[in-house]
Amino acid sequence: MLAFFVTMIFIFWRPKGLNEAIPATFGALMVLLCGSVSLADLGEIGTKVTGASVTILATMIMAIALESFGFFYWVAAKLLQQSKGSGIKLFWLTNLLCFLMTIFLNNDGSILITTPILLLVLKYLGLKKHQKAPYLLSGVLIATASSAPIGVSNIVNLISLKIIGMDLYLHTAMMFVPSMMGLIFMTCLLFMFFYKRLPKSLPDIPGHFQSLRHRRYHPLHSPSAPLPERNQTKIMLFVLAFVFLVRMSLFAASYTGISVPLVAVIGSFILLSWRWIYFKTSPRDLLYKSPWHIFIFAFTMYVLIYGLHNIGFTELLVSYFEPVVSGSLAHATFASGISTSVFSNLFNNHPALMISTFTLTEMTLNPSTTKIIYLANIIGSDIGSLLLPMGTLATLIWMHILKQHDESISWGEYIKTTIIIIPLTVLFTLTCLYFWISWLFL
């Protein structure tokens, strides 16, 4: 327990920008030395974590390739162009962009990509600090919560899928509609909450993405030469269609029993090969841009949680929660979703969802109850965790990026928004999940 809490403190604190994989590794070594996890357990952990890590890493590599030829700047310029000088339209389009980035990539990648671009756009528009906050806050909340509809947008969701033995296709069939309704509900709440602070008109802007290109504002540097303007839109639409095809292929692979990580790797390889041929950009940049630490972080965090599991922590949770969730599907849905939300805000959603999933596997429940508890846990982990900034790694990354660019949104300002938005959204989404599963899957 001590190793877990010390590790979480350093992950939240991150002194001098310390990579989160480093304290997680030291924590895992402490657990191994204490004997809470055996060498045999490491092999089982590897089988659970490797596939999810490869899938997420392949997606991040695709994001790096897309950034290198200006795809995201092009998207941002189109967003501004379509807003047509309206701050209201820009709000809705910003949230749509953040949603799509998470759906096509993943939540952490979406934050890394959209936050610097939004900061650049908002600075370019000359908005005041109180006018920027609605776009930045709604963007991070929607980008992070958008990992709920499909399992491949969050590494912990993928790991939990493997633990519970549920395929990606079934997860999406059961989860997509209720979580999308929850996201729409959240966006509407955010719009009403921020309406008075949104600028009603914006200055005129050029549509071409080169006007937005600014090296300092993006963490993935060294873009290649700009595309010829006449070919720009055609090529970008082709790339967008390809990324969409790859995402759809992941679900097709899950449905047909093909390896999902293999499909993700093939998609990344094709995009990188095309970039090399068309733009003459060597894949060497991936050696220093790719987030290789994802493997280490995912593996070592799993070791820590497995240690808690082995010393009886999940048995304790089972003794408390099994009588509650066994009562009815409604009890199972709301008790699981709310408890995972609380754990996520106390410990971060990565360990919270793993603990919840381990606890679920120890319960003797019927298949329907098991599935709805798992999905409710996802809602608590992906949406409920947003109540506090430390609830997700994505929000911590977001705050770090803001600080890098001399922007600041305090914990107080963040919580002032989320204390209203998040509990209502969690309850609404859990209600949608309960009725959706009851009507169509029972």
Curated annotation (Swiss-Prot):
UniProt keyword terms in alphabetical order: Arsenical resistance, Cell membrane, Membrane, Transmembrane, Transmembrane helix
Any Gene Ontology CC annotation: plasma membrane
GO molecular function: arsenite transmembrane transporter activity
BP GO terms, sorted: response to arsenic-containing substance
Signal peptide bounds: none
Subcellular location(s) of the protein: Cell membrane
Listed CDD domains: ArsB_permease
Transmembrane region(s): 22-42, 56-76, 85-105, 107-127, 136-156, 174-194, 250-270, 294-314, 328-347, 378-398, 419-439
Membrane topology of the entry: Multi-pass membrane protein
PANTHER family the UniProt entry points to: ARSENICAL PUMP MEMBRANE PROTEIN-RELATED, TRANSPORTER ARSB-RELATED
Membership in a protein family: Belongs to the ArsB family.
Protein name in UniProt: Putative arsenical pump membrane protein
Organism expressing this protein natively: Bacillus subtilis (strain 168)
